[in-house]
Amino acid sequence: MSKFLENLTPIDLNSDDRPKDIAALQLKVASPEKVLSWSYGEVKKPETINYRTLKPERDGLFCAKIFGPIRDYECLCGKYKKMRYKGVVCEKCGVEVTSSKVRRNRMGHIDLIAPVAHIWYVSSLPSRIGTLLGVKMKDLERVLYYEAYIVKTPGEASYDNEGLNPVQKYDVLNEEQYQQISSRFGDTGLDARMGGEIVQELLADLDLVDMFAQLKEDIQATKSEAKRKTIVKRLKVIEAFLHSGNRPEWMMLTQLPVLPPDLRPLVSLDGGKFAVSDVNDLYRRVINRNQRLKRLVELDAPEIIVRNEKRMLQEAVDALFDNGRRGNAVKGANKRPLKSLSEVIKGKQGRFRQNLLGKRVDFSGRSVIVVGPDLRMDQCGLPKKMAIELFKPHLMAKLEEKGYATTLKQAKKMIEQQVNEVWECLEEVVENYPVLLNRAPTLHKLSIQAFHPRLIEGKAIQLHPLVCSAFNADFDGDQMAVHVPLSDEAIAEAKVLMLASMNILLPASGKAIAVPSQDMILGLYYLTLEKNDVKGQHKLFANVEEVEIAFEQQALDLNARIRTVLDGRIATSTAGRLILKSIIPDYVPEKYWNKVLKKKDIGALVDYIYKIGGVSETAGFLDNLKDMGFKYATKVGVSISVDDIKIPEMKEGRVQTAKEQVKEIQRQYAAGLLTDQERYNKIIDIWTDANNSIAEALMDLIRKDKDGFNSVHMMADSGARGSAAQIRQLSGMRGLMAKSDGSIIETPITSNFREGLNVLEYFISTHGARKGLADTALKTANAGYLTRKLIDVAQNVKVSMTDCGTHEGVEVSDIVVGNEMIEPLADRIYGRVLAEDIIDPITSEVLVSEGTMIDEETATRVQEAGVRSVVMRAPSSCKAPKGICAKCYGLNMADNKMVKRGEAVGVIAAQSIGEPGTQLTLRTFHTGGTATAGKEERSVVATKEGFVRYYNLSVYRNTEGKLIVANRRNAGVLLVEPKIKAVNKGKVSIVVTHDEIVISVENNGDDEVRYNLRKSDVAKSNELAGVAGKIEGKLFLPLKDGDMVEEGDSIVEVIKEGWSIPSRIPFASELKVEDGAPVTQEVLSEAKGTVKFFLLKGDYLEAHDGVKSGDKVEEKGLFAVVVDDNNREAGRHYISRGSVVHVDNNAKVERGATLSAPEKTTQVVIAEWDPYSEPIIAEQKGTLKFEDIIPGVTVVEQFDEVTGDTRLELNEYIPAAYKPAITLATESGELIRYQLDPKTILFVKDGEEVNIADILAKTPKAAIKSKDITGGLPRVSELFEARRPKDIALIAQIDGVVSFGKPLRGKERLIISGDNGQITEQFIDKNKVALVHTGEYVHAGEKLTDGIVSSHDILAALGEKALYDYIVSEVQMVYRRQGVNISDKHIEIVTSQMMRQVKVVESGDSNFIAGDIISRRKFQEENQRVIALGGEPAIAEPMLVGITRAAVGADSIISAASFQDTTKVLTSASIAGTVDMLEDLKENVVIGRLIPVGTGMIDSDEIKFSAAE
């Protein structure tokens, strides 16, 4: 980098170099000499222009002598005119004769009488001047504004008479202190002054090298953390100055540069008024005050007046740079604050965003859009009026070329008169010339597409109906903009890359986006429906032509079921489907079209054709599909009448029943049997139930009406318009409505829209409707801001190389939450490259080898083989120095091919996440206690077959003989099937190496068999404990090293299901299965073929023919294998003991046939518990004693109506002095103490004797308040901003055993002692509930308290891979629930950008300081440099930075400054002399050159031209 800089020479600002000649951009602080070198003269007068002659005043702010002539090549007095005098300086008015363009870059200066501080370096935090001098910002401001004195040389001065408290250099004294001290010590060399001069002197005197060395020593010596922080801050500023070659005193201005006049113009308005740029007013105030100060100094005015004038000068310069930063803003004539230089560049209206990143362009126009159903996919209709304007220069050239016009003037005239030749030429110009159409808001790359224009009459642009969904356009008055690409390159790009017929797939997910919608779907749906008893039924037709003839002769109904010949066999279809078949390519299998086509089916059909036929075939097919859809929708003429909206007859009665049920609940509540919360929940449940059952009846009714030809049903069923929820409101009942705070009103709207609402119901409805509209407006803004942040953080990720050569990757598996599948494995691995081989879990052979790109077939194959997790190459583990490599990215979703070098994948990723943002909800869901009985889990049930294994599980057997779970965590129940059995009796040996586990059974003297297992295939302890990862499909070792086994015992097992404690089975649940018990289920064949039975011997299967249909299985390790015709294994099924076999050996079976089944068909329950309360159970036998359980104070007596007993219940609020508890004195004399929570109900009496596992008390779960769940957009931005949640949960940093130390200031001290002697301490707040107890074993990443887990903690405890997994699955959860498909890779790219910074822990021999936060790239470059010199490299830890901070902290100055915090970014960059290498997109857009992606990445010297031989 420094090498690179040595070869660069600075360019003058006004040089004629082109943007492509700029190699890099560096910001520095300007020295006074530099300012003078820029200047063309001093501005002495505040005047602007003469009011009579309107000529600029000499030496004023618009002076022509300084800044250059006003008219091109003409001096001010008019003595010299025309080009021939170029460069002459007029002796009369002093103006150089040259182009007036120089007024845009010639600068002037103002010679300030007193040095003035630059406000950016004073008030922009951290204050740079203050930091250097070690003075507080407030004190520094007091000195600069002449309110306090700063000491330069203290002499012998001290604050007291004894000299014990001496005055130090840089002390700030107020007026009183100064008067006192100077009267006593004034003649002993005390020098203390106020104002800019003294600050400038102090800065000039600093010896930075010396200070740097001194501070480096101090930082080693100091122990206090706070002191270290301040020293590091100072070190950073000093280091920045040393590196950049800036001098500290340059932060004080003595020469103020004056902006070129054309950049702060004076514009004359009609009516003789002038609109003047605010900057001019601010400059005028500076000049006025400076001139006045000059006079006062010359007159030797009293100190106090001069001082006041200097202060005012400082304020005037402050206002010029950043008005309103300090004190009140300076206001103009119209009472609004003037816009200072800072405001001119920052914000949406500032230079960066308004003029540099977004410019208005010529050759563009906009108009309303209308639908153009007769257009081809790559066409749009362009009004002739617009075309004639847009293509005017092209048109004029064409008219001349064809000889219709001799001069341009004549051509122009012809165009104005619109003679016939003009139209003829226009047709020729427009032919084959693409135009770009854009619809705002431009949310993703499909919002700008290219079309070939077709000239049309009228004034509206015609748009092809299939591209509407990409533009998100409709025809209710939307407008679109047209742009004409001018250069050959732009035209080529538009034709090759941007034509609408090329952009059929959505870059976010790779699914087709240009698919028919609405009317077209309705037409195609109707076309493929079947009707009974119509003309031409069951007739046989040879081909489509015959069908069409019959149809036109009205001998055949469109929906008649007919027979036809397909692939040489007779198949049934309908007339309509055969007509559709005529436009479908021949290679499409029957299953795609010979059925009723709904929206999803049409999407699948298009996807299939794209996959096989490619882009051009698909585009043609889509056009045909569109035409056919519209044609039949028109022919059919589906319409809705009131009679189509059927109301089910049972509605009345059902509503009545619900009302009765509600009355009953109210009665119970009045009798005191229910709490208010329970009553509310039950009522809501009753109405929800009623609504659902009415809706079900209604949908059934509509489906059967008219044999499925009911218009309402057709529209909703096909996916053309409307949904079940809307039909329910039309003719079912409107249902429950929400209040403004999100809670549900318990009286529902029982009417529907067909019956009409009464006034009250209508009133309740208006609220929801209005909230919907308000939400939408807010949502759009939020989603837009999120997109902008994402673009900014990801814009510099581009594909920079083909393969970075890494073997690392990220392990992915299904994303499942509870029982809901969020994203299946096949979706996650599609389009990615493998980092490790995929091994078939059954046959252990390599299914897919490393480095393979996974297509759809492979993905499905992998999922069907039962693979649970796959290691993929990922952006996060890519080792490319800049950007990312193609292999780690995978498929380019937009064209289904491997991504090419130069693809701007970062921007695509940001668009893919941001664009659907507007479809997400804005709500934070208040679950507000709607925890209904139906929702709570009360048991877990096995869904697969196998046998039970307890993992780490200890149980109590209570007095009734039931098994009770005794572990609180780090245990579980597994359902497994055998994988390897011991072939002999003996001792097990397990040896763990780096990546393998070798297991063997000792065999006296004989050769023992060893089994090698991949370490990654075996479930780790934290996975078994339910903390991390998925365990299904992993291997489980039931034995430990040194255990004895019998022959035939299983030593390696495959986990089929797992229920960890406490996340799936709570503490103190009742277990329904013993360890080792078989679990039988109905086993269905996964494939078609022949069944063969085998027994497991060691790790291979041995044929077994002692089984026939009807047998009950007694053998262990019996497998049924289904083989296909080639005798290859197609499916393997474990048959557990106790099953009844349903097929004979060697029997032929179809897919889905039953192979075996349990004797009795009942669910196998693994464990059960009470879902509403958490029990406290006795861990041993003993005697109880109550503590602080005092009736009337901490507990109340409750009379139980059912049993007639009284029980004690703790109060909700317990006085602070009391800590209610039960202690259990065991027989061994040990005391166990159980702390009791509020609302707990006691089941025992004081002094009672209890047995093991007896229930002592129960705490109701309802008392644990349900938290608001953040969902939708706020959740996404919370994840990407890496905010620390308010209600944060503590998580374990290491694996170890929990204990509690002595509390600190009312906080509990939780200690984890690790296996290798590490110890971590954490403090738990009073209002948090600890989820762990003394002596329990926890794994890193496990929650220790309730609350929300922070992503920063996941990174610290579990590392980067776990964090990736967390962010990706959390973001996917939000989008998938809204039905939005986004490929993981997009989310991963943004996440890897959030991880691009590291925090230095040890600096080694590098230039870093511990605690520095720097980009990974800088860190690696510096370490390589240090290692090359033989030094000690620095050590850093990964950091997670929110996207806003990551964007502001970008390596590029321009990109960071144009995003947010402009002044802050520019301030720190100028001091550090940061160099912007112009490597990314934004910077290059700003300086106006090609962006370095795609062909822009290839430097011009890489392309060599050579003469043809």
Curated annotation (Swiss-Prot):
Enzyme nomenclature, EC number: 2.7.7.6
Key words of the record: DNA-directed RNA polymerase, Magnesium, Metal-binding, Nucleotidyltransferase, Transcription, Transferase, Zinc
Cofactor: Mg(2+); Zn(2+)
Residues involved in Mg(2+) binding: 474, 476, 478
GO CC terms, sorted: DNA-directed RNA polymerase complex
Gene3D superfamilies in the record: 1.10.132.30, 1.10.150.390, 1.10.1790.20, 1.10.40.90, 2.40.40.20, 2.40.50.100, RNA polymerase II, clamp domain (4.10.860.120), RNA polymerase Rpb1, domain 3 (1.10.274.100)
Family annotation (SMART domains): RPOLA_N
InterPro entries hit by this protein: DNA-dir_RpoC_beta_prime, DNA-dir_RpoC_beta_prime_bact, RNA_pol_asu, RNA_pol_N, RNA_pol_Rpb1_1, RNA_pol_Rpb1_3, RNA_pol_Rpb1_3_sf, RNA_pol_Rpb1_4
GO biological process, one term: DNA-templated transcription
UniProt cofactor note: Binds 1 Mg(2+) ion per subunit.
GO molecular function terms listed in the Swiss-Prot or TrEMBL record: DNA binding; DNA-directed RNA polymerase activity; magnesium ion binding; zinc ion binding
Pfam family of the protein (one): RNA_pol_Rpb1_3
Quaternary structure and partners: The RNAP catalytic core consists of 2 alpha, 1 beta, 1 beta' and 1 omega subunit. When a sigma factor is associated with the core the holoenzyme is formed, which can initiate transcription.
UniProt cross-references to HAMAP family, sorted A to Z: RNApol_bact_RpoC
Family: Belongs to the RNA polymerase beta' chain family.
Protein name as annotated: DNA-directed RNA polymerase subunit beta'
Organism from which the protein derives: Sulfurovum sp. (strain NBC37-1)
